[in-house]
């Protein structure tokens, strides 16, 4: 838990405020801040740099001269990257610079960055009523009273942005005004001083303070989550299409499923309970057995002539045996 001073519009110290946020462990704090900074700075890139290749440059469809016989180097197009006004090799192309980060990690990095600036944090009382009419000179003098020198930068965090405060601050280049819902890691770490109003601090403590309930996602978090979900849906779904095709084939193969065993048993029981059905089954079984017996008899008759040798061969065999005996 850390404490910071509370100052009024005249620059007088009127009290102190405590700030206790759930932050990352010391051994991982620098890495989580690095990830959040890299994500924020990368997502800020537009990625509009784009060059044309030799296929996109206008012209160059005709071969400048014939392949052989001129004594000159071979050339197939006047828009070759080697030629003047030709295409560009490996130039920048339009692309999306998007890095995703879990919502809880983003919130942890934000709390860690804010808690790390406690020594440079100044709580000021709400001064919206003092800007009537809004004057840049009044805010510049108040910054000096609060301890922000002319060569130092500051981040002013308010609960809700008002037209009076914006008009009074927008012409001071070294001061950046943001609402509590616009809090980000880069702005917290990129200034010399962090100024926050008392109303913004109370909302911040109610949202992220120790003992507070789990923070609900802000509108920016919801928009980013929706963008990430849309990006995931836009990615190629070849694997999903292959799986769906396999599922369709399996569904077609199983279009005519076999009857369950319970249903088959039930059908057999119904057939046995009907005498006519039972007699028909017995007759079919007897006919099948008769056909099987007849087929076996026919096969036996066909095999008998093949097993007996011819009569002439029997006589020759007998004569040969008698000669051997003599």
From Swiss-Prot:
Residues 221-238 have a biased composition (Basic and acidic residues). Residues 60-71 have a biased composition (Basic residues). GO terms for molecular function: rRNA binding; structural constituent of ribosome. It comes from the Bacteria. Signal peptide: none annotated. Residues 212-326 are annotated as: Unknown. Belongs to the universal ribosomal protein uL4 family. This is Large ribosomal subunit protein uL4. It comes from Synechococcus sp. (strain JA-3-3Ab) (Cyanobacteria bacterium Yellowstone A-Prime). The lineage of its organism: Bacteria, Bacillati, Cyanobacteriota, Cyanophyceae, Synechococcales. The gene is rplD.
